[in-house]
């Protein structure tokens, strides 16, 4: 378990003090894959450096497995850091060492008896699928294979925690998928806690059990991955989810729906027309509930746009629907959606120019 309490970090700059982290509180359970995501400058890299105490925070505490780290001396920290493996974006392999030699290096530094090293390295290479490349040099293998070497090296001292700092951001989509599958497999086989630092929502969607969203050095949202995709609460999260799923309406689609709402208001004064964004999960995500809603409440419901994503085996649907009928029927339908615990965001209504703000795709 990783427990971070009230963590803050400030840097001195030529323009004054810069607050990189402010009041961070996180509880990461043992054995889970936890994502930390945010735009550039959000504080992600500073946070990961604080977790392994490469950067000392100005205030707050960091505990791993019940051991508080911020009060330890440098000598004590060296021992504790063996419990934390690190996978980097840039691989950081030694060019003059073979694949085998790079994985063996942390064992040599840790003082593992020489006769025990070969067996341990061979097991690690088998775990990451590189036993056939043991005698190759970094210049002779691909980027994805280099990252596998980095993962094996990070696991050499049997860490409790594996920190992945943008480990897939320099890889192509297929290689990224393979590396994420490997990390998930390692997590399941060894029980190591994996912390994924990333700016890619696609990475979070594929591997993370839970996710914390950082913005300007603060945690602005934290939830299960499927909940973050289904019902993002913060503007930063909504923007990142929309970009990853293309789940927002385009300007042209919104304008067309507004024209339909205006036309209905002119033709049928007193009637109601609402454009809703519905977020559904599980069995409801396919949209069968919508047809039931129309039938039960005598509504005319048009599907404007829909998308269903598989978030680690859970269907998460985003539906934009135009509901038209009497005001009472519309209110009854809203009550029914609330009873099913379905998130509803009203995007537009009559009159069309008196509508809430919308998160619109560019």
UniProtKB/Swiss-Prot annotation:
ABC transporter domain boundaries: 2-241
Sequence positions that bind ATP: 38-45
Root EC class: translocase
Locations listed in the record: Cell inner membrane
Domain of life: Bacteria
InterPro entries (UniProt xref): AAA+_ATPase (IPR003593), ABC_transporter-like_ATP-bd (IPR003439), ABC_transporter-like_CS (IPR017871), ACT-like_dom_sf (IPR045865), MetN_ABC (IPR041701), MetN_ABC_transporter-like (IPR050086), NIL_domain (IPR018449), P-loop_NTPase (IPR027417)
Membrane topology reported for the UniProt record: Peripheral membrane protein
PANTHER family to which the protein is assigned, alphabetical: AMINO ACID IMPORT ATP-BINDING PROTEIN, METHIONINE IMPORT ATP-BINDING PROTEIN METN
Function summary: Part of the ABC transporter complex MetNIQ involved in methionine import. Responsible for energy coupling to the transport system.
Family: Belongs to the ABC transporter superfamily. Methionine importer (TC 3.A.1.24) family.
Protein name: Methionine import ATP-binding protein MetN
């Amino acid at each position: 378990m990783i427990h971070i309490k009230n963590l803050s970090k400030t840097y001195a700059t030529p323009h004054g003090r810069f607050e990189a982290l402010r009041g961070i509180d996180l509880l990461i359970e043992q054995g889970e894959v936890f994502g930390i995501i945010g735009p550039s400058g959000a504080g992600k890299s500073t946070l990961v450096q604080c977790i392994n105490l490469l950067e000392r925070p100005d205030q707050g505490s960091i505990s791993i497995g019940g051991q508080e780290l911020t009060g330890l001396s440098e000598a004590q920290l060296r021992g504790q850091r063996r419990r934390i493996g690190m996978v980097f974006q840039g691989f950081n392999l030694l060019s003059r060492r073979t694949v085998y030699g790079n994985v063996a290096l942390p064992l040599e530094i840790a003082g593992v008896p020489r006769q025990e090293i070969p067996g341990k390295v061979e097991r690690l290479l088998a775990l990451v699928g590189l036993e056939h490349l043991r005698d190759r040099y970094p210049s002779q293998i691909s980027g994805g294979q280099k990252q596998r070497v980095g993962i094996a090296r990070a696991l050499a001292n049997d860490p409790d925690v594996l920190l992945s700092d943008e480990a897939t951001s320099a890889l192509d989509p297929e290689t990224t998928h393979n590396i994420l599958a490997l990390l998930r497999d390692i997590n399941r086989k060894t029980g190591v806690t994996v912390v994924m630092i990333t700016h890619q929502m696609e990475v979070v969607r594929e591997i993370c059990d839970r996710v914390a969203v950082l913005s300007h050095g603060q945690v602005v949202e934290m939830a299960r991955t499927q909940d973050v995709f289904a019902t993002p609460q913060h503007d930063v999260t909504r923007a990142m989810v929309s970009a990853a799923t293309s789940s927002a309406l385009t300007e042209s689609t919104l304008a067309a729906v507004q024209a339909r709402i205006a036309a209905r208001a002119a033709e049928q004064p007193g009637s109601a027309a609402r454009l809703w964004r519905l977020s559904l999960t599980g069995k409801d995500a396919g949209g069968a509930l919508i047809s039931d809603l129309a039938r039960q409440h005598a509504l005319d419901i048009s599907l404007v746009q829909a998308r269903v994503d598989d978030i680690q085996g859970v269907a998460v649907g985003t539906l934009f629907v135009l509901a038209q009928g009497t005001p009472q029927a519309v209110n009854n339908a809203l009550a029914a959606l609330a009873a099913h615990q379905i998130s509803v965001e009203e995007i537009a209504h009559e009159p069309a120019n008196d509508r809430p703000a919308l998160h619109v795709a560019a």
